[in-house]
Structure formats: structure tokens, C-alpha cells
Swiss-Prot record:
The lineage of its organism: Eukaryota, Fungi, Dikarya, Ascomycota, Saccharomycotina. Its EC number is 3.6.4.13. This is ATP-dependent RNA helicase DBP6. The keyword Cell wall biogenesis/degradation does not apply. The gene is DBP6. It is found in: Nucleus, Nucleolus. GO terms for biological process: maturation of 5.8S rRNA from tricistronic rRNA transcript (SSU-rRNA, 5.8S rRNA, LSU-rRNA); maturation of LSU-rRNA from tricistronic rRNA transcript (SSU-rRNA, 5.8S rRNA, LSU-rRNA). Keywords: ATP-binding, Helicase, Hydrolase, Nucleotide-binding, Nucleus, Ribosome biogenesis, RNA-binding, rRNA processing. SUPFAM superfamilies: P-loop containing nucleoside triphosphate hydrolases.
Length: 607
């Protein structure tokens, strides 16, 4: 029916003749061309040109054949066209098969057998250690004490405050003797003898640059030794001479409770002078507090580190006139990283003070466990520091503190709360205010509930009330418990069970005993716990309940080895008769104790 088309891909030798051109009308030629596959539209330009010539020949031939009245093409010509298309298809298939077989053979030849490995760690690159950073850390630890003048003092260094009447102002001396004591404690004597004359002389020479002459002050003194009164006297002595209210002293403390405690001491010393003392109250909004401090700039500001950074960012006040920076409970402050307060504060000081670098502010750093923070002290950029130490040990216990260890056999460890109550009659004091330290918040709640049940069942020989300071209570509840504990009635025993929340800085007068129901984890923590009693030259007692040989060895190796005591101080152990009396339990007491345990179990399970 159709004539074979011209195949441009087919080559003809010389002498061969091309197949006759198909004789199709022009319209039919176009229809046939449109029916071709779209693949032919993407062929080379040479093929398109050849097809165009082919079409022209078809038009010429069709005209000639129309003149002869022929409307169809012979069957032989149609077979030739189909054969040409089929041959092209077969050549394409054969070439594709050849390419596929070559690829398969190549891939088979390149494939390597898989290697079997055992379960071994994957090889890692060698660790690149920053030796420069390690050397830098070592250098920082060494530089923390470089150019440090060590001043040793002992428990015999007491002196009446009247001996300083030629240096201290009349009003300040009257406030000290009337509100605190007539005799200076050892650390107060050491500071007043060494620092006060130097500070007064430097201030009289230059009111602007006297901080460089004095240098920084580091004090390692036991808790309850009068550190707060010591630095407050130095501040009021200098600031009472100023003429205009400007922020000249910042006292940093770690907790809100300490803010108010320090404020009471500083405000009592500033009575009768024009020194303005302010505190940052955490229960007021930051915006309201900022407006108040801007309206009346204080001379002394008592604040926590995080709140200080907030005010610096709000530009509540400037550090341009700052002369004193006091860190109370410095070891705890330096362990805190609220908003990177230390770096932020040092940066602001160097930027805002008239002269840059160390010495632009007198830094007073106080703690009972100061010597363990040498690396962090370097961040404070100390300038010619003077280090006040008592003894050669890390920590020193006050001479008025009596310590006792009560070994408890492991077989009697289940009755530890009962032994605690049996201990009370041996504590010969008219009014017992006992602070019991445990290891966790849950232990505080459980022990307080169990002791209350035991007192209710008659296992206590003295009238006793028990309270628990814990994080489950609201702040108001904890504050009321502390106030009730501090105001305990005469002839009554008050027990307050707490974690180490109460072991730092809190000054409650009249705590007669500290009982370490659970041993602290370090000598540092032990010093702070025992420091809640025997404060301000008053007597106090600490009792440690040691269960089994393990706790006794821990006490000896990790706590007692770091502590120095007065020669005529603690006995450390109960005598054998007292110990046997405490750990020997009657069947009646044991039965009552088990009954109390069942009551506690029912109350916990809610049955």
C-alpha cells in the first residue's frame, strides 16, 4: 500500500541506485509524517534535511502517478519498507544486548570477595590533646597565689574593741560594743591590726587611688568566727567619710536568706552615719527595684550574683565609683555560674573604672573553705592579695565546739532513728535546739515523720517537737519552721531535720547541737554543717552517727585528716559505757519502734 521510505542511515555503494521515491500525495505525506514517533523529531539535522528532500521527491512522483491514474502502491514496495524498519530495530537490539553483556562481564571481573571481620572496635583517629590549655590551667592555679602575703593568726588573738578607739570613729565603736561584743574575735583582731591602719593611711593620701595601695584580702576562717562583722567594720569605717552617695561597695552572697542576714549586720553598724545600705529583694519585680535604686543610689548594696548581672544589663547603676567588692561564702559563689557573673562583673569593672586592671577595686573574699578554690580565684584578677590563715590544715574548728563520734554496729543500723532519740537525755542542756542533717530531701521528710511517731508513742524521754526543712515545703512554711525553731521554749527540745540547705551561712543563734545523721561527703561540707553551732564564742556540740567500719574509715581518711582543732578541744568519741547504753535496745523499745515503722508505712501508702 505504501512505498518504502528513504533510509538515510543506510549507505549505498557506488553503482547502487537508491530505492524509488514513494508516490504519495502531499496531504497524505504530511499525515504519515505526523504519525511517526516523537523520537524521530529529536534526530540530527542532517536527517531532517534528507527527509525534507524525500518529501519533495514524493510530491513530484505523486503528481506524475496521478496523471496516470494510479492510487496505490504495490505489495512488494510495502514489504521493503517494513523490512527496513525491522532491520533498524534488530540492529538497535543487538547493540544494546552487547553493551549490557559487556557491562555485566566488567562488573563481575571487578567485584572482590567480601572480607570477614570480627567484633572489634572501629579504628579511631588519635586523640589530639590541647597541651597548651593544660599548661594554662596549671599556670592559673599557680598564679592564684602568686605575690600572696600569708598572715597566720590563732585562737588566742583576742582584743577589746576599745583598743581601736584611736582609729575607729566614736559612733562605729559604740555600735559594735552596744550591738555585738566588746571583745574582738581572732579574725577580727587580725584584720583590724593588719588592714585597718593600711586602709586608713592610703585613704588619707589619695581618695581616688587608695585601692591599689591596700590590695585584696582573702580570709579563710571557720564559720561563726565573726567574718561578717569584720568586713562590715572596714566598709563603714571608710564609707562614713564620703560626702556624696554613690555605689561604692557591693556585697555578694549566695542566697536570699544571707542577703537579709548581712543587711542586719551592716545596717546596725551604719546607725548614726549617713551611709545608705540597700538590699536586692528577690520578691520584688526587677523593674520596680531598678527604679528605686535609681531614685536613691546606695553606698552599700547587698545582692546575689544573678540579680547583680540583671541590674548591670538594665544599667540601673554604674560601677564607676565602686571601691569594695565583698564575696561572702566565696567558695559557694565561685561554684555558681549564674549568667557568667564573675566574667561579666570583671569586664564591667575594667570598662567603667577610671583605671583598668587589677587593683581598681578592693576585693574581700571570705569563706570557711577558701583554699580549695585556687583556680577560680584567678578569675577575680587579684592584686597583691593578703591571705589570712589559721593553722596549717585546710580547715580549723572553733575551740568551743565539742565533737563526738558514735559508732553503731551494722546489725543495729535498722534502729538508727531510735538511737538518735535515746541520745537526747545524754545531751545535758536546759534548752535543746538540735539541727539534724540527712543526705536527701526524701530522707528529711521520712525521718521527721518517723521521729514524730516515735515521740507520740513515748519513745522520747524529753518533751520534743520535730520539724522538717525540705523542698516540698513553700518558702513561707520553711521560714516559719526556722523562726519557731529559733524561738524554742526553755526546757523543751526542738529538732529540725534538714539537708545541706541549712549548712551555709544561715545564722540562727542558740543552736546547741548538730547531729550528722548521714555523714557529709567531704570535710568541706562537714565544716559548714558543724558551723551552725558554737558561733560567736559560744559553746556547741556536734555528734556524728557512724554505721559500721565503712563510715568510720571514711570519717578518718576523708574528713578528720583535713581538720585542725585546739589542743584542749574535742574528745571525738563517747566513752564505752555511754556507747553501750545507747546501742543496747530493750525488747519493749524494739517492739514500739517496729510499731512506729508500720504507722509510717501506712501513712506513706495511704492505707
Amino acid at each position: 500500500m505504501f512505498a518504502a521510505r528513504f533510509d538515510p542511515s543506510r549507505h549505498y555503494e557506488e553503482g547502487d541506485t537508491a530505492p524509488p521515491a514513494p508516490s504519495l500525495p502531499m496531504k497524505r505525506s504530511r499525515d504519515a509524517q505526523q504519525d511517526e514517533s516523537e523520537s524521530e523529531m529529536s534526530s540530527a539535522e542532517s536527517e531532517d534535511e534528507a527527509m525534507q528532500l524525500d518529501d519533495e521527491e514524493e510530491v513530484v512522483d505523486s503528481k506524475g502517478k496521478e496523471n496516470h491514474g494510479s492510487d496505490s502502491i504495490g505489495t512488494g514496495e510495502a514489504d521493503k519498507r517494513h523490512q527496513s524498519v525491522l532491520s533498524r530495530f534488530q540492529r538497535t537490539i543487538s547493540v544494546q544486548d552487547k553493551l549490557d553483556s559487556d557491562a555485566i562481564v566488567g562488573s563481575d571481573s571487578e567485584e572482590e570477595p567480601a572480607k570477614m571481620h570480627g567484633l572489634v572496635p572501629i579504628a579511631q583517629p588519635a586523640i589530639v590533646r590541647d597541651t597548651l590549655a593544660q599548661d594554662s590551667r596549671k599556670e592559673r592555679k599557680l598564679l592564684a597565689w602568686s605575690n600572696t602575703t600569708k598572715i597566720h593568726y590563732d585562737s588566742t588573738m583576742t582584743k577589746p574593741f576599745a583598743a581601736y578607739k584611736d582609729i575607729l570613729s566614736t559612733s562605729l565603736l559604740a555600735n559594735v560594743e552596744g550591738g555585738f561584743s566588746r571583745t574582738a574575735f581572732p579574725i577580727q583582731t587580725a584584720l583590724l591590726d593588719s588592714v585597718l591602719p593600711l586602709m586608713s593611711q592610703a585613704y588619707s593620701v589619695s581618695k581616688r587611688y587608695y585601692t591599689r595601695k591596700v590590695g585584696d584580702i582573702l580570709v579563710n576562717a571557720s564559720t561563726g568566727s565573726g567574718k561578717t562583722l569584720a568586713y562590715a567594720m572596714l566598709l563603714i569605717h571608710i564609707l562614713s567619710r564620703r560626702t556624696v552617695n554613690k555605689l561604692r561597695a557591693v556585697i555578694l552572697v549566695p542566697t536570699k536568706l544571707l542577703v537579709h542576714q548581712v543587711y542586719d549586720t551592716v545596717q546596725a553598724l551604719a546607725k548614726g552615719s549617713s551611709v545608705v545600705v540597700a538590699v536586692s529583694k528577690m520578691d520584688t519585680s526587677l523593674k520596680e527595684e531598678s527604679a528605686k535604686l535609681k531614685a536613691q543610689e546606695p553606698d552599700v548594696l547587698i545582692i546575689t550574683p544573678g540579680r547583680l548581672v540583671d541590674h548591670l544589663n538594665m544599667q540601673t547603676f554604674s560601677l564607676k565609683n565602686l571601691k569594695f567588692l565583698v564575696l561572702d561564702e566565696a567558695d559557694r559563689l565561685l561554684n555558681q555560674s549564674f549568667q557568667n557573673w564573675c566574667i561579666e562583673l570583671m569586664t564591667r569593672l575594667n570598662a567603667e573604672r577610671p583605671f583598668k586592671g587589677p587593683g581598681n577595686v578592693i576585693k574581700m573574699i571570705f569563706s570557711a573553705t577558701l583554699t580549695t578554690n585556687t583556680e577560680r580565684l584567678h578569675d577575680l584578677q587579684l592584686h597583691n592579695p593578703k591571705l589570712f590563715l589559721m593553722g596549717s590544715q585546710l580547715y580549723h574548728m572553733p575551740a568551743q565546739l565539742q565533737e563526738y563520734n558514735l559508732p553503731i554496729p551494722t546489725s543495729k543500723s535498722y534502729a538508727k532513728p531510735l538511737i538518735l532519740l535515746r541520745l537526747l537525755p545524754l545531751l545535758s542542756t536546759e534548752s535543746l535546739r538540735i539541727l539534724v542533717f540527712v543526705k536527701s530531701n526524701e530522707a528529711s521528710i521520712r525521718l521527721a515523720a518517723l521521729l514524730t511517731a516515735m515521740v507520740g508513742n513515748g519513745l522520747s524521754a524529753v518533751s520534743t517537737t520535730v520539724g522538717s526543712i525540705n523542698n516540698n515545703n513553700s518558702k513561707a512554711t520553711n521560714r516559719k519552721l526556722i523562726e519557731a525553731f529559733a524561738a524554742g521554749a526553755s526546757g523543751h527540745c526542738s529538732i529540725l531535720v534538714s539537708t545541706d540547705l541549712m549548712s551555709r551561712g544561715l545564722d540562727i543563734s542558740g543552736i546547741s547541737h548538730v547531729i550528722n545523721y548521714d555523714l557529709p561527703i567531704s570535710s568541706q561540707q562537714y565544716v559548714h554543717r558543724c558551723g551552725r553551732t558554737a558561733r560567736a564564742n559560744t559553746s556547741g556540740t556536734a555528734v556524728n552517727l557512724l554505721v559500721g567500719k565503712g563510715e568510720q574509715n571514711f570519717w578518718k581518711d576523708h574528713i578528720d585528716s583535713d581538720i585542725s582543732r585546739a589542743p584542749d578541744g574535742s574528745h571525738l568519741f563517747f566513752d564505752e559505757e555511754q556507747r553501750e547504753q545507747l546501742v543496747s535496745l530493750s525488747e519493749e523499745d524494739t517492739a514500739t519502734y517496729k510499731k512506729c515503722l508500720e504507722e509510717l508505712k501506712k501513712s506513706v501508702l495511704g492505707r
